[in-house]
């Protein structure tokens, strides 16, 4: 029991001396003296054994000396620093402080060294977590001289070496090597401390939304045919785009089924890489160029636009026909038909069809197919701006108003295209009024009667109007009575009939005058005929022999 108590007292004494030395209270010589006496009192063995006990006490002292008030880990041997043949110190061993919170620090020193020869002290700091402002302090042994350090530093007035590490990451190591030269025999106690501020990092992911808009639409479209555009919106950024809105003003030359002039589409939030497609349909109102503009906006971002220009084409064919407003029956009349393409597209399979009224005969139509009163021309293509001209020669057999109808039909990329025109000609007939005068009894005795018959015939193709007849007789004949389609008057030897308002084509009327022979001789009877057609009156004379 006494032996156990003596051993415990010895360990306690050596540990106390080591603590006082590490804190700088005892000098090296004093610590060595106390340690030696304690060991001698504890064990009365031979001097050699005493020396062995003293060395063992130092080793125990090193194991149990607290560093920064942390548990000292078991010693680990390491190889000596520097070339083996030049070393004046023993194998390195390591003292480790377990600290799972901030920084783990280890210190490696040789087991023994030679007075006057430098030996290394290796300090290794390992980050247990991310730390900043890491300060490592080493207390130099009292009976030793500072030689150098790596990284380099300068001892303070109280014999301390200080290194500052701005940042030591988790798992990262920082090594410091200090060379000191012992000046006296004894134990060289070296203490190192570390102070660090744990670094807490917070990560906020920052991104930038990038809304892009593209638009697809036709380069060409047809008038009055639907035009469809596709608006593609995509978030090519790295953050969510909030409150994405697409606005599409309706172009002036377009109309939308909703009647609105600005179309608005609310897309809401769009994640990175998200894609949306909007389809809009318009109806073109007029030909020409139309530009559709789509604008996209989102919260905190600038507006982007995309536009597509479409040429609105109108397939158009025009036809006109020109001819005489009036003409005489049986006189040829020429009609000129003009066909043109004022549109934007090529017209194919163009058919020009001219239909004449019954009673009109086609005399000539170059390059056409004639069938009764129909004339047809065909053309494979009619380019924009191109025009064609056709002529047709006709003649009417009867008077009247006749219309010439022309229809043009064609095909294009926008469908069929049709146009029509007409021309009306008034065909006039020509009145041809003739008169024939004959006496029924010739010769005639004085005192007897004879009858003059006057036949008026319109041999023409048109009626005659205001047909008037007047008869004059010589003194040998005395008018007694008359008859006809109109009334008449007898004045002396003259008979005048009222005008006949109308004498139709191929119509014949007859006038008669009864005459009494009053004296012998060669009598004469003259009939004078006038009408609207006869600008100069026509006369006819008949003679009668009276005996």
Swiss-Prot record:
InterPro entries in UniProt: Chlam_OMP6, Chlamydia_OmcB, Ig-like_fold, OmcB-like_DUF11
Pfam families the UniProt entry points to: Chlam_OMP6 (PF03504), DUF11 (PF01345)
An example Gene Ontology molecular-function term: extracellular matrix structural constituent
Role of this protein: In elementary bodies (EBs, the infectious stage, which is able to survive outside the host cell) provides the structural integrity of the outer envelope through disulfide cross-links with the small cysteine-rich protein and the major outer membrane protein. It has been described in publications as the Sarkosyl-insoluble COMC (Chlamydia outer membrane complex), and serves as the functional equivalent of peptidoglycan.
Localization of this protein: Periplasm
UniProt keywords, alphabetically: Cell shape, Disulfide bond, Periplasm, Signal
UniProt region (Disordered), positions on chain: 45-84
UniProt feature, compositional bias: Basic residues: 52-61
GO CC term (a single one): periplasmic space
Single biological process term from Gene Ontology: regulation of cell shape
Signal peptide: 1-22
Species: Chlamydia trachomatis serovar L2 (strain ATCC VR-902B / DSM 19102 / 434/Bu)
Major subcellular site: periplasm
This protein's name: Large cysteine-rich periplasmic protein OmcB
Other notes: In strain L2 the origin of the observed doublet has been shown to be different post-translational cleavage.
Complex formation: Part of a disulfide cross-linked outer membrane complex (COMC) composed of the major outer membrane porin (MOMP), the small cysteine-rich protein (OmcA) and the large cysteine-rich periplasmic protein (OmcB).
